Design a protein with these regions (language model features):
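Catalytic cores of histone-lysine modification enzymes
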Residues: 3-103, 189
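C-terminal SET catalytic tail plus cysteine-rich post-SET Zn-binding segment of SAM-dependent SET-domain
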Residues: 96-195
Length: 195
């Protein structure tokens, strides 16, 4: 006797609901051990050229609408996966600077695994791993203790911290200059001499 694959499928380990990080998120529907395969990140397989075109199009749209929802995931050197296409609940997993999940590519497919033990109700997150060259376009709202303020790969954090330190020093110098200007006594206008 064979059971249908539908009856044999495991219950979902996640649920989609409102997130404090960014609109919609994915949350653990059960306690999970480290290295648990949670969900597959699915979508349309596209070339790097098409990926770049869509990315630019989405960034232009974001400037107009404020919605910067980009679900393009690097698959390999030739292809990306556009998770905005089709049924893909994994696209709602938000970024965190202290993620509890990570993505792995297995035989051309992307799976999200738990990095550590996760409690039922915890929001599932992973580090999006963006390049440093676009850091200003991607502020981070994760709220974790070690948040660096922008969505970049952890390997870029030391350089990003140096950049932010320089920006802060430049801004502080500018503010001190403005404060000094404001503190200067205003010269009183000289009275006109009587003739």
């Amino acid at each position: 006797m064979h059971l249908s694959s539908h009856l044999m499928s495991a219950p979902l380990l996640y649920e989609v609901r409102e997130s404090e990080i960014h609109n919609t998120g994915i949350f653990a529907a059960a306690d999970m051990e480290p290295n648990t395969r949670i969900v597959e990140y699915v979508g349309e397989k596209i070339t790097k050229k098409e990926s770049a075109r869509r990315g630019i199009e989405l960034m232009e749209k974001a400037k107009e609408t404020g919605d910067a929802a980009v679900y393009i995931f690097t698959l390999n050197k030739r292809y990306d996966l556009d998770g905005a296409q089709g049924e893909n609940p994994a696209r709602y997993i938000n970024h965190s600077c202290d993620p509890n999940c990570e993505a792995f590519i297995e035989r051309g497919r992307i799976f999200i695994y738990s990095k550590k033990a996760i409690k039922k109700g915890d929001e599932l997150t992973y580090n999006y791993g963006f390049d440093l060259d676009t850091w200003e376009d991607h502020p981070c709202l994760c709220g974790s203790e070690n948040c660096v303020g922008f969505i970049v790969d952890e390997s870029h954090w030391p350089k990003l911290r140096r950049i932010l330190k320089r920006h802060a020093a430049s801004r502080q110098k500018w503010l001190e200059g403005e404060a000094a200007k404001a503190a200067k006594p205003v010269k009183k206008a000289r009275k006109a001499a009587k003739i």
